Amino acid sequence: MSFVPGQENAGSRSSSGNRAGNGILKKTTWADQTERGLNNQNRGRKNQPKQTATTQPNSGSVVPHYSWFSGITQFQKGKEFQFAQGQGVPIANGIPASQQKGYWYRHNRRSFKTPDGQQKQLLPRWYFYYLGTGPYAGAEYGDDIEGVVWVASQQAETRTSADIVERDPSSHEAIPTRFAPGTVLPQGFYVEGSGRSAPASRSGSRPQSRGPNNRARSSSNQRQPASTVKPDMAEEIAALVLAKLGKDAGQPKQVTKQSAKEVRQKILNKPRQKRTPNKQCPVQQCFGKRGPNQNFGGPEMLKLGTSDPQFPILAELAPTAGAFFFGSKLELVKKNSGGADGPTKDVYELQYSGAVRFDSTLPGFETIMKVLNENLNAYQNQDGGADVVSPKPQRKRGTKQKAQKDEVDNVSVAKPKSSVQRNVSRELTPEDRSLLAQILDDGVVPDGLEDDSNV
């Protein structure tokens, strides 16, 4: 028996007409391009689904490949679309774990011209197809295909195709993409309809009347009615506005030193138990160095904090506030109030101990175990023990001045070159007396020079 995603929720259709039979809100994307019913204005014409660029038939009427799920759109350049092993398959009611296997297909969207005449390429969007369906229905799991990312759950048998029927857009709406708890969405991507951005493709979201006059106007290359919304128009308008302002839509916001300092100070001003470490305020600035009492975090996670791509899956293990208070052993301990010069205040510590239990049936179990093993007691494997991240060497103040002073102190005073320079007294020799006698007119040596000379 073939499985139909969402069939467990199948029932009576909503009388308001805005819900599909599986209880999912109707939403049209590239994966669900079809015109709505035209009531009595279509004059008996049968409603035909739109063809996509990759499914245009060569001849005859071919049902295009419609994904069962909404797409995932890239919004940052240079990001890689990939999932951890055992993750990446959208969940849907009625699909067992053994059938959760398939691939994500990259849809390269068109480019448009900006007001300054440059071509702007829209970033691609990805759609999921079960194994044995979609554009690469004949491919085997794991084949090296450009623009294809293979995913499967741990319980799925990838050597056989999934027993999933092709989606008929006239009877089944696209299901908003959701993943099992613990799944890490690739950075730089968002799920269509998840609230990250307004849905970019809404073609066919309103019934359009296409009488003979409308067909003639379309064939004459005249302007389409203003109510027609082209695919990706929302993103195109946003890109045009940014181009007008001289900004790049794909350029991330730059963090300056001043803004990083403000973020760090804002985090450190919070109580210790309320701090959230990130790139601007790393783990060791928030909670101190790693050691026996704070033994979690490898070099990369200590640097990025909660911004680490592996952190969200660990957050699945974190207890709630209720579990913390009602599922732990708590003890209130009074601590010293501080120094004698400080203000008098009572200081307490709420000490706690507990455990989080999980088993191999937890979604993403293998990834969780891998991340835990890499970060538990990681400080022991680093040089310097608890100093996982070496502090930045600080320049000692006054070192240069002290060295200059020592150099001056070590310089010896130059000795006088002669006894005259040193002004040292000495007794005259006979040669001195003879020379003085020749100089003096009377030939007598003065008594003052007999024993001492300042010459």
Swiss-Prot record:
Compositionally biased spans, kind Polar residues: 30-42, 49-61, 215-227
Residue ranges with Low complexity bias: 9-23, 193-212
Main subcellular location of this protein, as a coarse class: virion
Binding site for RNA: R109, R125, R167
Phosphoserine: modified positions: S170, S194, S390, S425
Presence of keyword Transcription: yes
Keywords: ADP-ribosylation, Host Golgi apparatus, Phosphoprotein, Ribonucleoprotein, RNA-binding, Transcription, Transcription regulation, Viral nucleoprotein, Virion
Protein origin, superkingdom: Viruses
InterPro entries: N_prot_C_CoV (IPR044344), N_prot_N_CoV (IPR044345), NCAP_bCoV (IPR043505), Nucleocap_CoV (IPR001218), Nucleocapsid_C (IPR037179), Nucleocapsid_N (IPR037195)
One Gene Ontology cellular component annotation held by this UniProt entry: ribonucleoprotein complex
Location of the region described as Dimerization in the Swiss-Prot/TrEMBL record: 267-384
Post-translational modification: ADP-ribosylated. The ADP-ribosylation is retained in the virion during infection. Phosphorylated on serine and threonine residues. Phosphorylated by host GSK3A and GSK3B. Phosphorylation allows recruitment of host RNA helicase DDX1 which facilitates template readthrough and enables longer subgenomic mRNA synthesis.
Subcellular location: Virion; Host endoplasmic reticulum-Golgi intermediate compartment; Host Golgi apparatus
Molecular functions per Gene Ontology: RNA binding
Modification Phosphothreonine occurs at: T177, T429
Chain intervals for the UniProt region annotation (RNA-binding): 56-197
Positions of the CoV N NTD domain: 64-193
Residue ranges with Basic residues bias: 393-402
Stated family: Belongs to the betacoronavirus nucleocapsid protein family.
Subunit description: Homooligomer. Both monomeric and oligomeric forms interact with RNA. Interacts with protein M. Interacts with NSP3; this interaction serves to tether the genome to the newly translated replicase-transcriptase complex at a very early stage of infection. Interacts (when phosphorylated) with host DDX1; this interaction is essential to produce a full set of subgenomic and genomic RNAs.
Protein name: Nucleoprotein
Annotated source species: Murine coronavirus (strain JHM)
